[in-house]
């Protein structure tokens, strides 16, 4: 998805079964990140980078929300194990992943399969995508997201 376009509306359930939608973030800036699987090395590094810099996001008026195919129970364990201060949405049917072009063909060790494409969108207060990051540096993702913001 390109910057300057309207972010697709979505409705999903967080780790506690509470409904979460893009509309919940109207008037707020949102970091919406898509990742393959809870508790895997890259996904853990990415989540912990966001956690360790969460105060910076809040200071700049951002909310953070993660989305993966994992179950709500898996998300609860992931949040608890790593003390994540933000919510994670369960998308087992890949509806949100597909709407945000974060589901597609991947190549790993010469084999092709469909899966989650690690992607992050920064969405402004009006629901417009202001940044789209497709080549995520899991250990330094905050630098990619916030760039020159202080």
Task: Describe the role of every protein-language-model region.
Residues 1-150:
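Chalcogenol-based redox active-site neighborhoods
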